[in-house]
Amino acid sequence: MEISENTLSIMKNFSGINQNMLIKQGNTIRTITEARNVLATAVVDADFPQDFGIYDLNEFIGSLSLVDAPNLDFNESFVTIGDSTGRSKIKYFFSPEETLTTPSKDINMPAGEVKFVLDNETLSKIRRAASTLGHDEVLVSNNNGTLTLSVVDSQNSTSNSYAIDISGEFDANTNFNFILNITNLKIISGDYDVEISSKNISHYTNKSSPVEYWIALEPESTYKV
């Protein structure tokens, strides 16, 4: 079987969430952080013939780049990665499931009190602001009836901040401050439908690709009716 550039791109993104991965038979891949506060799933255009574990996903992706047009031939304990000529081959061994961090179950997403579209341009602005200001938190709040995303230091009220107003669905009579750690916002570039629940979890659905993320909020997040 072959691995497309699109599948490789998703795997590279998932390697930023967790270096290891258990890939199940079929065309759906999933990963979760060691802290179990970020879960990601994607439907890819590769149909894997069996379950197999990869301990170092970046190394595996790098191995695929050693040959042109990599073709994968699966065996019970390893995969042979060959090139288009049949001259070059890589024998890559799998890792046992017990050595990997894997999602134990699907997340039952609670109903979200706040919904909005996070477009790629806004996401890029937030990331740039976080890098420039040296902050690692994104605040989603009701600012006098307007939904606002802010890059802040929630522990320092006099620190510099960046804010951008966006359109969204929420009860204007509620007061909420949902805090996300920017380091957990490891989503692939694109536009997203976002839903945030007062149960301290957020859900991101890519609008152009079957990729989803569930990201826990920081415990200091608040929601008041």
Stretch-by-stretch model annotation:
Residues M1-F93, G112-V225:
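DNA polymerase processivity clamps
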Residues E98-F116:
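Long, charge-dense
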